[in-house]
């Protein structure tokens, strides 16, 4: 009886590992868009945190020093927004996978 129970656990673990690998691949290929300045600056980022595209509204293009600082701040804010969205998406998708596990509060999975 113990032998059958262990085999069942091993099978479940293998199935979960396969599901997690598939989900990690889906997350890595997913894209999110971070924005700032009401959409004047946007950043498209993959689940691997690779930046695919940065879009800057033409109205922000200027040679003024003050405008340069504003643009730099908006780009940083858009990047941070994209990173937060990638992390939130990852937590939401993996949350269903780990729902039955007894994990300590604040525990982060290594992916």
UniProtKB/Swiss-Prot annotation:
InterPro entries: YbaB-like_sf (IPR036894), YbaB/EbfC (IPR004401). The keyword Transmembrane helix does not apply. It is found in: Cytoplasm, Nucleoid. It comes from the Bacteria. One of its GO terms (cellular component) is bacterial nucleoid. Its main location: cytoplasm. GO terms for molecular function: DNA binding. It holds the Pfam family YbaB_DNA_bd. Coiled coil: none annotated. Keywords: Cytoplasm, DNA-binding. Residues 87-111 are annotated as: Disordered. Belongs to the YbaB/EbfC family. Homodimer. Binds to DNA and alters its conformation. May be involved in regulation of gene expression, nucleoid organization and DNA protection. This is Nucleoid-associated protein PputW619_3586.
């Amino acid at each position: 009886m113990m032998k059958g129970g262990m085999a069942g656990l091993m099978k479940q673990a293998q199935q979960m590992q396969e599901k997690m690998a598939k989900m990690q691949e889906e997350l890595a290929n997913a894209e999110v868009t971070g924005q700032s300045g009401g959409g004047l600056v946007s950043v498209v980022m993959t689940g691997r945190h690779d930046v695919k595209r940065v879009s800057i509204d033409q109205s922000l293009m200027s040679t003024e020093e003050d405008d340069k600082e504003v643009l730099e701040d908006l780009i940083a804010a858009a990047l941070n927004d994209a990173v937060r969205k990638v992390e939130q998406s990852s937590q939401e998708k993996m949350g269903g996978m780990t729902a039955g596990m007894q994990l300590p509060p604040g525990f982060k999975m290594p992916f």
